[in-house]
């Protein structure tokens, strides 16, 4: 287990910290204040917040005061923000629906900022495949290293599962079942929940968010994209009942156009492995099943990931492994994976990997920032580390980029297409990036 | 055995004007202060120091609440600290050893704890453990000040000569020094922390980074006394009683420490070594309880994390079958009798599965399902195993605890007809302990075995590993004084082990690898 | 209390030449033999008979191993049997009551048991229960004959006047008669079965059809004796001790049985009634054990089906907290003291959830998961519930068992100054028992309550339901003899209950609904 | 719970018993001796074995002697057997592959037997849809009442689940997940296992047998056929390792053409309910999941059926129910379902239904025979009970017929078609029987 070695970069590097400009950091509410901000706090000398932009400058000023961001400036316009040379990395943490209209001009203005090296965008990188393709192209032309927050890839449980699979602990993968649950999309809607996540097209729904994160994690763990897929998308609950905080119905119904159930099945490119997925909207039922179950059956062993809520990328999961370690397993890169001394080959090994007090919501984003600073300061002293890379793909190292996001967008596009056309689609080509 | 214990005893504090400064402070403070100034170009306010420890006998039994015989050693960890007065406070850590990269993190303004990422292996996590236990101590000590306001910002310079991963408990030394420093930094010169409090809050500190150890290391580091070893007890309550070695006729009792230089990182090997052993002995206690129809902990005490231990089993067994409902208070004679009985029960009920218990075997003896056992026992911390060797682990814990009681009797015998008697008897206990650690607990390693055999044939009466094992240091009972054979042992080890195993070893490294440790002073403070 | 018990006592056998034939046989055998001949045009070889029973006090406590006070009544089940000598034997069942359709099934040639489909509700299943326990008894008695060869084929004609679903235990009467018949048919005239054996093998018979009841019904049916009630104990071993009612000055002690005519089918309502109560009291015992840190059954005794009961808890509690390691032997005085203590513990630990325990509540007190509790406690037999009322059920079992001990003391007191003393005291116990069955065990019904209130205001000193409840019969302590008020009670019930509730009731039906039961003879055989 | 009332027919009816002619009853081996024979034994006077036919008459003679069938005659030819007037009901219990070639001529010859009333055929009623259609038509023309052994419909657990659903205990069905396991179709094959069950086209495989029984049970419980379905059929294990009884590999590999994994998803006609199924071949792994799990989520409650082996129709299942009984639930036939007295409407009800010593292998077939005799002797005194019925469909009463089997065959046909065409198929019309 070596993936968990902390980068040896000093959190007080001799080199200057990465100067971060935030679009969407608001001390009062939102996702960034709960995750990006605490992560940067822990790496306080590798990242320094130097610029904030939000449509109303008062929000930025208030946030700077509230968080005492001594080195940060509030910018009145997107142009002034994007072209300011005080920024090395721009983080876009706003509603997916406004990604396109903000990032495209921002990249344009940013041409005046020679220091801009990184563009960090929250998943789901725009609401449609076309928007995602355009943003990707613009960023590539602009020549920045891109980052997408598919932070499930950084979860210690996912990395441990990836390690076990890649070191042959379960032999060849035989079949996979996933059952997940997307909290908001059931019969009842909390009155305070924001309207836009219930309207199709805003880039936040059961397929794009819940399924998107989970299927990206599955591909990453198994190091394989899909070859054929079929999907059925359901909106069996066109109207939801509004409820107050204590869960009592207010007797008012509100329209919902996003799906509340997804059936997805397909085969992995590597080994034609059958994969069966069922994602349910609605309050997670605690009755007889966990809300997130990923079962991976192999010829030499079984792996199981379980979580209480349906969101794999922000849950503190439990990993179960049981299998007979195939020490005669020729590893992908040819060399022999060393069997831990003291194990006799034939016997079944059991592993349970759970960190009782791991905060996954902050932790996974924190480790994503760590991997950015590892890359920036080349803490692992990797010889001739390229200044940029197009996509993480299935490497342990690095971080997911807009290309990884684009490939995931193409898969989600084919999910909707398969449902609409009522046909099984061949998706084995969506992972070839073409500039 | 001097009866005074550390209830009101204060952690010793010295300052530049102190008449006679303890040697470790006198020797090491000047250099660390100079290094602090060069790093932060400011003078530190004080230096907190806490030593490493060697354990004479009683390995892997503290987390079962059985008593141990450690002594603080002359290797320690110093933290030079400057208290800052910033609006949004942060802590900067610099370590003299470049291997440990500089770290800086902010203190949450709302007074909440600094989060520790248990999935990561980094030296700053250990600092955060000390910080956490001190912070929770301060929240209770002065809630009005620390409930919802951040601790003081600090600049810290750390330097230590306790070799890491050597089994001399560098992590405990570091954690105790940090906890002491954080309390001093936030309570100011007027507040004097008791040894008991420092010991109590640090014994659980390493759990925050995912190592479920007992309290031996911290107790020895805090309560160490010159020329005194320590009898550390965890139940009925946490107590450290210093005692002197018996006066022999014409030899001194001295212990040689030899480092195998095989580094064993407790955190990274925890799933197959340290934490796995904790799971095995906890499971053994519960299987024994199920077999003999007793309940380890009543509804109130037990919890999803507290599953009871082998000492609890001994108590409830005696309550049910011998009508003694008060738990064992540590009395030596009754302890020896009961531990002997426990070893009989272990043979009776666990010996039939010497090849080890599978998960199904254990679930069956506990009359619960696979999933239930996995959920209750295997999710406290990451573990990886093929079988759980309940028989061997339980047999080690009870026999080792029995040996500690016999060792204490020897140590507190007024006089011996011949020096040889002491050396022979105490040495025998140490050798049995090494055999048990090796064969039953499987926490020795080839290098340890090699060193022990060389030492035994060159003047050592008792040789064993010390600390968690799987590498790290060994301890040897060698008659000291003029006609002792310390030199003989050092000679033999240098030639037959170090120069063979590490041909390119330098004299300095050799010097450092084999030391004769005098029991040293525990945690203390030096105020500038 | 006459000390003789049924160890070597043989089930009484009579034949046509017997000097004086017991009344039930004399009255009923001729008619059943005639009916057999008309059905099979052959003469039966013998008639097996077993009576129903009424329970004076001690309801729903036999499956917790607490003692009860039943007596056999003058209603019984007769089976006329002809043993066939066919190559592939089968059993044909005809019932005098057309409601029970004729049944025929073959006996597996390899001597294996006849399968019972537990998912089906049919009278022939009860025959198969008797057949099963007799078959397994025969396999042990004469393995060489029955290990791998089928039992003898039979033609059976059944006729009984124990009203089904009336709480007078028609199922036990039937099962005991069948078991007796099958053993007699296969062992021949030379073998004489003991009452103890017949009782021992029939107490578990109904479990094969999915009703997890205790052994009271079968014990009373087998061991009944004229003019004697029975003190039936299950622990330390299964024992039925006949005793006579005390001689009063100028009244007879008699018990009136009044049938509510509300039929309650124990099998079909089991998931929400009978079997649910068995689950509730078993769960209560385990929650109490967990709360007070004791283990109900040691590893060996416990099994996936045997979860221990409230009597086991009493024993292990006294072992742990009062150093009395031998289980309670049934002694009345110590029993009263302990049961009183148990009621205190129930208040202390279960009273906080009077609204009932949810599955999560129970899982939490047992420190196991929802799934674990469901798997271990709820899959023994089908159950359906909203909450488990552990407090109320445990309180009923302990208080009812206490009342039985007091009732036994009354029954074995030599003399009473005034008849009124006996009637008042025994009546009070019965009324408390009815209140507890109604309010705590919730197994009464409006008709039962109505009949009891009418009887109490018309000369009955004690009125309560008898048997499982939820309908069926009631029993009333009424002074008999010349100046008794049996007629007064019968009158009142007829006018204020039966004619009101069942306007079209015929005199014959009324005659049958209210009977004065004299303790009757237990199981017996009549050979032609 | 009233489905479990035992029929009141006397097992010694005044009328004559149904005389049964068996094709395929062999005392030495096979399915019928383990299930049909013990069932008839328990109903010994409602059914009487009067005739046996097997290609080699010695087999029939030996069976009659072994089982001491005093009233049975061994027939030398299919013709003599089929036309003998001593038979009221013919039971076909032979390999599915020979169903067509035996049943077609048999029906023809049977025209000389005026007494033939019942034709009982083992699932899977022929190896293809065409054969099944032909057999169905021939039997219909011949005018016999037909029976198919979809005996899962008679399992007490399935009937109890059907009762709970139909009485509104789980409200509207929201989503369904099924995970099953077909023992023989994995990496290893017992050397004694018959070859034909590994060759596609013999009517015995993971889709026809394991999936067939289970999906029929699902439709029966939910009283709904499918509207749209998609399937992916896999043969990832073209060669299996031969093993001996103790499971050691013999070092010999044998070809397999039947599938070893099925992915199936679809929507139920009633309520557009999403259904996700994954059927795995191979030794049931006991590691972290049961081998048969059926989860049915509803708006008012959840139902779960679990079994140790993957075969729902022959396993002793456990039924879990938890939900709040909707007592205001207007029942299909309009009248109010009585809520058990003593339950307060709002509170959650929990039910666990398991019969510890129920022998499902014999029991379900036994109850199928019981339903035949209930029909034959009209034990439930149903006024104007028709002499024949075409299909059971979703009734509690009666038994499944060749029409029910035909509809299931059409669904299985569309499973293979969907896989071959790579498309989602509309199957809402397959349940209309057309003569």
Swiss-Prot record, chains A, D:
Modified residues (N-acetylmethionine): 1
Record's keyword terms, sorted: Acetylation, Carbohydrate metabolism, DNA-binding, Galactose metabolism, Repressor, Transcription, Transcription regulation
GO BP, one annotated term: positive regulation of transcription from RNA polymerase II promoter by galactose
GO MF annotation terms: DNA binding; identical protein binding; kinase inhibitor activity; nucleotide binding; RNA polymerase II-specific DNA-binding transcription factor binding
One GO CC term, this protein: cytoplasm
UniProt entry tagged with the keyword Repressor: yes
Subunit structure: Monomer.
Function text: This protein is a negative regulator for the gene expression of the lactose/galactose metabolic genes. It binds to GAL4 and so blocks transcriptional activation by it, in the absence of an inducing sugar.
PANTHER family: CONSERVED EXPRESSED OXIDOREDUCTASE (EUROFUNG), GALACTOSE_LACTOSE METABOLISM REGULATORY PROTEIN GAL80
Other remarks in the entry: Present with 784 molecules/cell in log phase SD medium.
UniProt protein name: Galactose/lactose metabolism regulatory protein GAL80
Organism of derivation: Saccharomyces cerevisiae (strain ATCC 204508 / S288c)
From Swiss-Prot, chains B, C:
Pathway this chain belongs to: Carbohydrate metabolism; galactose metabolism
Residues recorded as bearing Phosphoserine in the entry: 381
Residues that coordinate or bind ATP: 165, 167, 169-170, 264-266
Pfam families cross-referenced by the UniProt entry: GalKase_gal_bdg, GHMP_kinases_C, GHMP_kinases_N
Biophysicochemical property: pH dependence: Optimum pH is 8.0-9.0.
Gene3D superfamilies: 1.20.1440.340, 3.30.230.10
Active-site residues, record numbering mapped to chain: 217
Catalytic activity: alpha-D-galactose + ATP = alpha-D-galactose 1-phosphate + ADP + H(+)
UniProt keyword terms in alphabetical order: ATP-binding, Carbohydrate metabolism, Galactose metabolism, Kinase, Nucleotide-binding, Phosphoprotein, Transferase
Molecular functions per Gene Ontology: ATP binding; galactokinase activity
Any one of the GO CC terms: nucleus
Family annotation (InterPro entries): Galactokinase, Galactokinase_CS, GalKase_N, GHMP_kinase_C_dom, GHMP_kinase_C_sf, GHMP_kinase_N_dom, GHMP_knse_ATP-bd_CS, Mevalonate/galactokinase
EC assignment: 2.7.1.6
Induction: Expression is regulated by the GAL4 transcription factor.
Keyword match NADP: no
NCBIfam families for this protein: gal_kin
Stated name of the protein: Galactokinase
Native source organism of the sequence: Saccharomyces cerevisiae (strain ATCC 204508 / S288c)
Gene expressing this chain: GAL1
